[in-house]
């Protein structure tokens, strides 16, 4: 995992716009968001975390990751039954969303690498075509 390429620019902009953020940024100079550069993983985590507490999301995600044998990928998720995903603590809608994401990734209907070439609105529109993913995902 590494710091996102936009991190330093974002800190600078936030520091100029908000005094509280400036103090926090200066207090935590070593702190940073990290990226895995894995869109599939991140979208699964986003779907799992929707409308539940952080503690619940962490618990469900841990079970989900174990079901994937430690490697969350479209191929591994696609092999899992809906029942296995439900046993992880996922709702029927979240199971459908994650299975849909896996299938569209495998079939290349969803191409994660395109997102980096899009502006924010284009990326939001593209991602919103996926079940369980919207503007705030």
Residue ranges and their predicted role:
Residues 33-41, 89-93:
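Structural motif
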Residues 1-38:
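Intrinsically disordered, low-complexity, charged terminal extensions of DNA damage-control enzymes
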Residues 1-4, 37-40, 75-78, 118:
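Short acidic alpha-helix initiation/capping motifs at coil-to-helix transition points
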Residues 52-53, 57-131:
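Alpha-helical ds-nucleic-acid-binding substructure associated with the helix-hairpin-helix region
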């Amino acid at each position: 995992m590494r710091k996102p390429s936009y991190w330093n620019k974002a800190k600078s902009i936030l520091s100029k716009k908000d005094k509280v953020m400036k103090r926090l940024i200066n207090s935590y100079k070593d702190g940073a968001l990290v990226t895995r550069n894995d869109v599939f993983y991140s979208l699964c985590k986003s779907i799992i975390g929707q409308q539940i507490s952080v503690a619940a999301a962490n618990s469900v995600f841990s079970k989900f990751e174990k079901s994937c044998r430690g490697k969350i990928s479209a191929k591994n998720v696609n092999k899992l039954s809906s029942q296995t995903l439900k046993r992880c603590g996922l709702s029927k809608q979240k199971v459908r969303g994650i299975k849909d994401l896996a299938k569209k990734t495998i079939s290349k209907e969803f191409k994660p690498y395109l997102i980096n070439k899009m502006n924010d609105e284009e990326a939001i529109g593209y991602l919103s075509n996926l079940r369980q993913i919207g503007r705030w995902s």
